[in-house]
Amino acid sequence: MELKEFAIKILEMFECNEPKEFPRKVKEALFSATPSKYLDGYVNICDDLSVDHLQRIYQFYNADRAEKKQDYTPPSLAKLVAYLSYSAGQKVVYDCCAGSGALTIQKWVTDNNLTFVCEELDEQVIPILLFNLSVRNIEAIVLRKNILSQEIYEVYELHKGERYSKIQQVLYESPVAPDVAISNPPFSLKYAVKKNDIRYLEIVPPASNTNFAFVLNALSLCDKAVFILPTGVLTSKNEKGCRQKLLEKGWLKTVITLPGRMFESTSVTTCILVFDKQKRSKDVMIVDASNISTPIIREQRGEGDASHFYRVYKKEFNALSDVQIASIIELTEKESHNVSMLVPYEKAAEHDFNLSPGLYKELEFNENIIHRGYNEIVEDINRVIRERNVIKLTVNKVWANTLNLTEIAKMNKESNEIVRQINKALKQLGLKCEILNNKYINISTDKELRIENTDKEILSSLLLIFMPMYRQHVYFLNNEENRLLAELRDAMLPDLLSGKLTFEDTNN
């Protein structure tokens, strides 16, 4: 069922006049005299309980990317985490930053008898989490909690019933020792941990982000944990100390880099880190799964008046098939040439504890390949950039969100940073050729949109038809540019290996 159509049915069932009422109405339904009316209604609309369907509705209407860094876990990624976190005899699972429960649901699919401890700070998403647990008849404790400061605001207990879990709000948490932790925490929040916090006495995460703060919190509760994190945790300078200490202790078992474009609301690339405090060696298995994926198309109706509501737009993402999930699991157990590498602690130390897979692959350089000259490649790149720059779009920030252009603007900025680095490298080689900057989009704070909108208060409906074509044109040219940049990269490789070229380290 298409998202908008599904959302309308769910919102009508909860008697929501507008989407922002959704969390409140769900909570009212759960604590009403007849919660089974709504639970039955949900099952009638969607009888597949193996997927967190409510997640997509909440994310579309209510998720907070800017402040809380909320991006909810794709189902196939949650399924991979469920299998990676398996061990015999598990009874209790801790879901750190549980969100709407996507990870918990996939873990529950593997074993319906598991008990869950779910911690989540966002008051708005707690009702969605409770509904997801109850409709699946899951035994759980749910805490609305600031995991970093350890402040607890609300506690709920869910006990299995005949068909649905019964929910009860309680005053105090009943401590339960988890066997494993699973988590997709908010990425790179800023938070300075307290000096006397026993979770961080041996390993102190940086104040600039909380990625490893969440990890260390989980490892203070149980010996095994599986985390989805941004790939920056593998290379950033300010998190080097955490990587080093975790490797010294032998707690980091596996690193898996994932394909891009798996999340709906962010282009940040991600990885999975598997921890095991019972592991006896300091070696770490590094798996490059960035090229293992299956493209999927998600359909969604347009926003705005009827002419756009009845138009279905398509967006492509990457997902993992069951076969690909099984392949990744297998790669974590054995080495495969340049895909999964068992890296000794000493080798990681040689690379300053940078855990990017590329550092540990064997270089394969074919001297028989003859590349075109730099000038010729750069000329082709500039041809693509010039064509893309012919139309410059200046658009108000609010309208950019409405038209799904914020990702395009981010790509423009990221591309210019790559161009800056390559131009610096070309100068090192004594070449005069230079790649042009991208100038095809500008996000403005003024109420303006140029290609050109005459009314500054009203957004022309024509643009809602035009923009999907514009985005596809940019994506096409981005792919063409990436192909040529890859050719330029390969041409530079001999000069890079010989030391004639150096690139600055831009990691924080």
For every predicted segment, state its role:
Residues 157-159, 179-408, 462:
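A conserved structural/catalytic subdomain of Rossmann-like adenosyl-cofactor enzymes
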Residues 75-183, 188-192, 230-231, 248:
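Conserved S-adenosyl-L-methionine
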Residues 73, 210, 266-268, 480, ...:
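A generic structural signal for residues located within well-ordered alpha-helices
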Residues 344, 366-432, 436, 444-508:
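Amphipathic alpha-helical coiled-coil/heptad-repeat segments
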